Regions:
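Small-residue-biased structural context
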Residues: 1-149
Length: 149
C-alpha cells in the first residue's frame, strides 16, 4: 500500500520552479538588463518560495515529529539555515549585478549568479529528496494516513 506523502505536491511545485528558473538562467544573456531582470525575478521568486516552505516546515511539521528523532530534525533545521544562507548569497549577488556598469561586468556577474543558483538548486533537490525519504519514514512510523491528512 502506498502511504500518504506529505511533501508530494509542494515538492513537485518547488522542483518545477527550480528547473524552470535554472533553464531561464542558462539561456539568459546577462548583458541585456531587461532579459536579466526576468531571470533574476524568477530567481527571487524561487528563493522566497523556499524561505516560506522552510519556515512552514520548521514551525508546523518539525515540532510535531521532533520528539521521535531530535537529531534528525536538527539536521533538517540546519539544512534550512544553509538554504537561507545560500538564498541570501544569491540576493547579494543580485545587488552586485544591479551595480554593474558595463556589459562585460554584467556577463561576469550573471555567470557567477548562474553558478550559485545551480548550487542552490542541487542543494534543495537533495534536501527535498532526503525529506521525502527520511521524514516520511518517521511520519509513517508514528502516524496513520488519516492523521497525516
Amino acid at each position: 500500500m502506498q502511504r500518504f506523502n506529505t511533501f508530494n505536491m509542494i515538492h513537485k511545485a518547488l522542483r518545477a520552479m527550480l528547473y524552470d528558473t535554472a533553464l531561464t538562467m542558462q539561456q539568459t544573456y546577462f548583458a541585456d538588463t531587461d532579459e536579466a531582470a526576468i531571470a533574476l525575478e524568477k530567481m527571487n521568486h524561487v528563493i522566497h518560495a523556499f524561505e516560506q516552505h522552510g519556515m512552514h516546515e520548521d514551525t508546523i511539521l518539525m515540532p510535531v515529529i521532533s520528539k521521535y528523532d531530535q537529531s534528525m530534525i536538527a539536521s533538517f533545521e540546519d539544512e534550512h539555515k544553509e538554504d537561507l544562507s545560500m538564498g541570501n548569497k544569491l540576493m547579494h549577488l543580485h545587488k552586485i549585478y544591479n551595480a554593474t556598469e558595463s556589459s562585460e561586468e554584467r556577463i561576469l556577474a550573471g555567470s557567477v549568479i548562474t553558478r550559485a543558483f545551480r548550487e542552490y538548486m542541487v542543494f534543495n533537490l537533495e534536501h527535498m529528496q532526503r525529506e521525502e525519504v527520511e521524514l516520511n519514514q518517521l511520519l509513517w512510523e508514528h502516524y496513520s494516513d488519516e492523521e497525516l491528512l
